[in-house]
Swiss-Prot record:
UniProt xrefs under HAMAP family: Leu_tRNA_synth_B
Gene name as annotated: leuS
Keywords from the named record: Aminoacyl-tRNA synthetase, ATP-binding, Cytoplasm, Ligase, Nucleotide-binding, Protein biosynthesis
Identification of the protein by name: Leucine--tRNA ligase
Enzyme class, first EC level, given as a word: ligase
Family annotation (PANTHER family): LEUCINE--TRNA LIGASE, MITOCHONDRIAL, LEUCYL-TRNA SYNTHETASE
Gene3D superfamilies, per the entry: 2.20.28.290, 3.10.20.590, HUPs, Isoleucyl-tRNA Synthetase, Domain 1
SUPFAM superfamilies attached to this UniProt entry: Anticodon-binding domain of a subclass of class I aminoacyl-tRNA synthetases, Nucleotidylyl transferase, ValRS/IleRS/LeuRS editing domain
Amino acid sequence: MQEQYQPSEIEAKVQQHWQDTKTFEVTEDENKEKFYCLSMFPYPSGRLHMGHVRNYTIGDVVARYQRLQGKNVLQPIGWDSFGLPAENAAIKNSSAPAPWTYENIDYMKNQLKMLGFGYDWSREIATCTPEYYRWEQWFFTKLYEKGLVYKKTASVNWCPNDETVLANEQVQDGCCWRCDTEVVQKEIPQWFIKITDYADELLSDIDQLDEWPEQVKTMQRNWIGRSEGIEMTFQVADSDESFDIYTTRPDTVMGVTYVAIAAGHPLAEKAAANSPELAAFIEECKNADTTEAAMAAMEKKGVATGLYAIHPLTGKQVPIWAANFVLMNYGTGAVMSVPAHDQRDYEFAIKYGLAIEGVIKPEDAELDISEEAYTEKGVLFNSAEFDGLDFQAAFDAIDAKLTAEGKGKRQVNFRLRDWGVSRQRYWGAPIPMVTLADGTVVPTPEDQLPVILPEDVVMDGIQSPIKADKEWAKTQINGEDALRETDTFDTFMESSWYYARYCSPHADEMLDPAKANYWLPVDQYIGGIEHACMHLLYFRFFHKLLRDIGLVNSDEPAKRLLTQGMVLADAYYYTNEKGARVWVSPADVTVQETDDKGRTVKAVDSHGNELVYTGMSKMSKSKNNGIDPQEMVDKYGADTVRLFMMFAAPPELTLEWQESSVEGAHRFIKRLWKVAHDHVAKGTTVSLDVKSLDAKQKELRRELHKTIAKVGDDIERRQMFNTAIASVMELMNRLQKAPTETEQDRALMQEALSAVVRLLYPIIPHTSFSLWKELGNEENIEDVRWPEADESALVEDSKLIIVQVNGKLRAKITVPADATKEAVEAQGFAEEGVIKHTEGKTVRKVIYVPGKLLNIVAN
């Protein structure tokens, strides 16, 4: 065995072995319990970052641990390879997205292999290949046949100069990223999938997700947003027209003093014909940012339409206002406004001098709305026959009256909206729909799938090549001329079913049901919490669609979810002569002064620029504070990087990158290697004879088996990998100091090291693989079982008892583990410190906590 730990040499050799023996390639085996471990697949951006490394290390640790439990473990990998960054890179280089994407895949694949992740590479998929998206297109046509797909107009970001649709990321301060033209909202036809048909099931089945983080489940419940309320009809005064509103607070309806409608509401557009002010307001609203964050932050504005609505219960007329906080594509496009009991309505009413009428008051106090709305539930007053009712009684009574008069009905609504899957981009899967000469829209026939995206294109940054190439859209259906859809799928489509394709990646069908139902659901899914409401919801939705089309049996795609925290690093900048911040890589920084807590006070870069230290922040290109995994692996080895990633923080918390801690991880592996080397150098060992061990040897063996039990529990149940590693480190401290003179000393060391390398195998697999062999084992470590704690070793022969007199420590005694209370008392009273502090006193009470404490009360 070589004396020095040489990670590059060891890791290359072990990785070659895994590749040659196809160690991690698996097939279905009904005689073995399966375990499907999956980390969210990467976008091939060019290089792995530390966030990737953390995600995939966690997944690999779980997968390797489960393998040593004797399970049939599937851990696949692939590439979420469609998307806007490839288009942007192609525009920048006047090239095509495909070569850029495939080059990045090749590079990142080598990086993943370099880190020693145990993937079944035979199942590798790339979502930009026709072999993959063909089945996505096929599935979409099946959903269309089931009535789950429809087309309607929806708003997009539009650049009038380039005459093109922009993604949200391409809108900078309201302008086009390329030509700086002001972006407007434009209505264009788009395809939608009816996720709302599954809203109830998506919500109720959250209760099945026992092993998902509560935070993710809460976020999904809120995103789906089920509410119970009443939809009621308001008649427009002096007109045959009417409109509906929906409210979850019908108890406040008697306090309605105005109605707010969306600028795009038909009533507003009609009224605008006679109001230039309203027409201008409608135009202004058309170009407004309607994201939730923008809506929450913007100034609430409105214009009176001149129209009035008739209150469905009182018959009173209330003004109708067009307001920028009401959206036409959300709810009914109209809301009843009760300023006394809604803060937004209150502020709007104050601003425009509208009436405020209180109708709800606290049970035990008078209503005070002099400074703000009263938004709590309470008791109705000023509400005619509903006076004195509480929320639920008022809800029921108002519902009954509106229903009886045909003016309203109880209704369940959802915040969730149908999924718009059309993207006016090029680098995505073509939507498999065609328009016939008579305008009829039909799915592409199955025998014409896949609709292949041409890859040999040049991006000009203005129009999608498949929109610009009029010939590409031309096709024939049953001999009749037709035009293909030139929109492509939202890339969330590809990531919504990739986990299932891994089960049968080469099947000439979307899924092989037998294989899919062997592997699914995923046993452990790992990814960032930022995906809680988009990917993870679509992922669940698609699984139910797959089930309802007969391809899978289960209701949910993943049993257990782990959401790992971000990786943070120090961030520094200086301000250049133009007043702009220039972010400097931590690798280019010299810290000149720190405070008493070790925080940076003064730092400069290699050019002498004085830097501002902004603290730890998420590694990002924008702050130039990313650390290249390749550099760290070259410097310390993959196992060191993996060990640091798992030890530095619990997996769901943020991890602060500190190279000094990476060095600490490296020192630990070198120490482990040295202990093993010194042990192996002493030659072969005899078998361990547990019965002949002395007290110190038994104590060391007890610590070993306690560690085995704790590490298994920390990894499997608690997923506290950092505390598992800490336990092994503590044990190694003991082993380093353990005697090795006798044959049984060395036999015990052999048992301990054989266990330690298996405990660490999921985390530092290259080192563990090598040490396992050096310890004289013929089998490869992947083919052995996780160590089991010897229960008999955990039984203590003796106990250390603390002896107190009047609550103060006076002695420590060692007694047999099965000693009686009387024997412990006798031994305790015989101690010199006890005699001294009880002499001449009367013993009033003796308290014995078995195996721990003897307290003598005397005065």
